């Protein structure tokens, strides 16, 4: 894809009850926090990532965005400067807040990472854009990168991950796997769930134009997955 503007949107979803409440916002040079209902987002300036919590539970630890530029993979961790802002929104998902981190510096395209939080919804949306005054090309964008997933599910030997085959593969079936795999890649969406209490975390794409979306889950243990990567590529 060649353009001076690239965008991708993907979906976070954690299945549990939400309670509506007001907004608490604080910010400084090193971090900025957003609290909406039971959702909390915190920017970590040292890791250039976002912590996402629901209630007292950390759901995603240091979420960062990445993309391919020429032959290199660039992430938000490679940028020298950042700016955090928050504003109210009212879109077709409802009333909520737009939490935005703009990364600049090191002669890289401007990267704008956005999170959309709704106090009455049980999910968080995220996308990121790349902006440049000169032509650029990329065939890989990954809005969700987590090197080590927190333990979200209750411990149990029946924790599993859902595999969905790519749409042009007629020979592989939908299947849920115990968390004993080394790596698992699902198409468009996956669910990491406890098959006893049925609590789950769902991650997948909301919209894109012509590329395919994959969710790659790295090795953890029988109770929890390791890493998590959501990407789209040609």
Model region roles, listed by residue range:
Residues 2-14:
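Bacterial N-terminal signal peptides that target proteins for export
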Residues 12-22:
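Bacterial N-terminal signal peptides
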Residues 26-27:
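C-terminal motif of bacterial Sec signal peptides marking the signal peptidase cleavage site
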Residues 32-101, 105, 114:
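Acidic-aromatic substrate-binding/catalytic surfaces of carbohydrate-active enzymes
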Residues 97-153:
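Acidic, contiguous internal or C-terminal segments within carbohydrate-active enzymes
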Residues 231-234:
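Conserved small/polar residues in nucleotide/adenosyl-binding loops
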